[in-house]
Amino acid sequence: MTQVSIIIPCYNEQNTIALLLSAVHDQTYPRANIQVVIADGHSTDRTREVVAQFQRENPDLAVRLVDNLERSIPSGLNAALDAATGEIIVRLDAHSVPARDYVERCVNGL
């Protein structure tokens, strides 16, 4: 099965990032083949704490938090891409909630 990296730039998404991570966790694509890379632009809210809590509670999903030093979406995407290890890259926004089969459909479409 093909490895997929989901890259997510974010900034101050404490109210939405858990919903996104839960939706990624519940994807029909096998969790063992998904890596999530979140590029945080030095959030001033609890975004990092929410991500850390999700990581502790869901060790079966590889979630990595990296710094977006320039605090811009392009910089965040580049930082996430640098940390990504998947053969396929899927980009999501931190405030999105993808359908359960979103990753599977992306992979099948390639």
Ranges and model annotations:
Residues 3-5, 35:
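Cell-envelope/extracellular polymer assembly enzymes that use nucleotide-activated donors
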Residues 22-33:
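Short, acidic, metal-binding catalytic loop of nucleotide-sugar glycosyltransferases
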Residues 33-42, 64-68:
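Short beta-strand/loop segment that forms part of the nucleotide-sugar
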Residues 67-84, 105:
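Glycine-rich, basic loop-to-helix element that forms the pyrophosphate-binding segment
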